[in-house]
Amino acid sequence: MRQLLIAIPAMDEMNFLPQTLNSLLSEHVSSSLKVYICVNQPDIWWNEADKQEIVSANMDTIRYIENLHDDRVILLDYASKGKGWKEKKSGVGIARKMLMDSILKNADNDDIFLSMDADTIVEEGYLSAVENLFDHQEIKVLGVPYYHPLVQNEAQNRSMLRYEIYLRNYLIHLIKICSPYSFTALGSAIACRISACKLAGGFDSRQSGEDFYFLQRLAKSTNINLYLDKKVFPANRLSDRVPYGTGKAIENGVNGQLDKYPVFSPQVFEKVRETYMLIDDLYQQDIDTEMITFMKHHLCDENFLQPLRNNSTSKSQFRKAFHQKIDALRIFQFLRAEQAKMATTDEENLKTTIETYFPDVGEKSLLANLSFQHSSIATLNKIRNFMFQKEQQLRYNFDKNRQNGSI
């Protein structure tokens, strides 16, 4: 029987994990369901007075899991005294890696791996929808749709909505330029066949950003599908445990630190599209687009394309090699550099995006006097919902177009 293998890292998560587990274990699936939970912390925390609350919470989590007496739930204890991380390799990245390594020992290539977070609940029918998708299509990887819930805190909601709009704006642009790196990096929203996990090398042990680099490696080895009619609900909460990720982004937003998450203008993505359109020509000759010029300086190599040409015997081979070289990280670095040259505001860039791609937007009043700082939460939430709906349509069409070979 095929297995659904869910991986959840957990540190100080007793306030969230029971609800997450309930949403997963109450699902009716035809596959064998296993939920692996890695309760983790640096071992040195046992000796640090200011970490005792987290240490105690982790012990409570371990007891909670053990008391479930549910064969579907497998505990990985990297928190008890003497079992925690050595300081140099602590973090969610190593937790995800240990989860993946443990799962791979007991998995077949056609089993389905799902990356989750302890604070994320799933929409009813989510697991069966994933099953059906992987049953009826030759799909290797799925970037799962997501939606952050509102909470009873205006500043937190404002920051979350601003961040989610940033994420959706970014993916919408990537899909519009047909980038092979069209995905949103959320550790709670990834599903893939075990065969694809193996091909991509699994998670690495970065302190954070491990979901981005895992998806980037997956995108280099296979297509990432985007559409599912169910979604996951990552928690809307503050966190300073890692330097990146949703919790840190929301905390930064509450503190007014938004420079890491610019709402990109369509103009900067057009510069990527311009280069994409010339990839076949670049196989034959040098063409200095703005993106190519940036890469020459960024890579400290005026001739970075020549080895790609030398190792390619056709345009299609060169095209693949180009995308392997100019990957999701390089694209993001270029976009940030180009966006920094522009004097437009985040609000202006969002309005331009919506007016360019979705001129039929019904409530144009939403865009009038738009301000991430001052517009009402209701207004920002309507914009978020509008972008979610449009993104879902684009996800669906992107998958269909790639399936029939039109992109």
Question: What are the language-model segments listed below?
Answer:
Residues 206, 218-233:
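Catalytic donor-sugar/metal-binding loop of nucleotide-sugar-dependent glycosyltransferases
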Residues 252-407:
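Terminal low-complexity segments of carbohydrate-biosynthetic enzymes
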Residues 125-161:
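Conserved donor NDP-sugar-binding/catalytic core segment of glycosyltransferases
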Residues 171-191:
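A recurrent flexible, glycine/aromatic-enriched loop bordering the glycosyltransferase active site
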Residues 206-213:
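Acidic donor-binding loop at a coil-to-helix junction in glycosyltransferase catalytic cores
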Residues 45-110:
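Active-site-proximal specificity loops/subdomain of glycosyltransferases
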